[in-house]
Amino acid sequence: MRLVVCLVFLASFALVCQGQVYKGGYTRPIPRPPPFVRPLPGGPIGPYNGRPVSCRGISFSQARSCCSRLGRCCHVGKGYSG
């Protein structure tokens, strides 16, 4: 009998720990979008005088606009994508 009580307790404790019993009330933190670095103004991001263009020189909103319009995005630590 003690074994059954112990197993029931452990099973209910495991369900609570996994969040199966109390599904409401807990919300996860909202993940933040990846940070942008500033690309250079002008046309699409690409080579400049034969050298790759670094991400510098314009505002955050301009960088985001360039990313959405041209599909060429620059992320901190990752370089260009798109």
UniProtKB/Swiss-Prot annotation:
InterPro entries: Penaeidin
Record-level GO cellular component terms: cytoplasm
Subcellular location: Cytoplasmic granule
GO molecular function: chitin binding
Keyword Signal: yes
Residue numbers bearing the Serine amide modification: S81
GO BP, sorted A to Z: defense response to bacterium; defense response to fungus; killing of cells of another organism
Positions of modified residues (Pyrrolidone carboxylic acid): Q20
Keywords of this entry: Amidation, Antibiotic, Antimicrobial, Chitin-binding, Disulfide bond, Fungicide, Pyrrolidone carboxylic acid, Signal
Disulfide bridge partners, by residue number: C55-C73, C67-C74
Pfam families: Penaeidin
Signal peptide residue numbers: 1-19
Function as written in the Swiss-Prot or TrEMBL entry: Antibacterial and antifungal activity. Presents chitin-binding activity.
Family of the protein in this entry: Belongs to the penaeidin family.
Protein name: Penaeidin-3i
Species: Penaeus vannamei (Whiteleg shrimp)
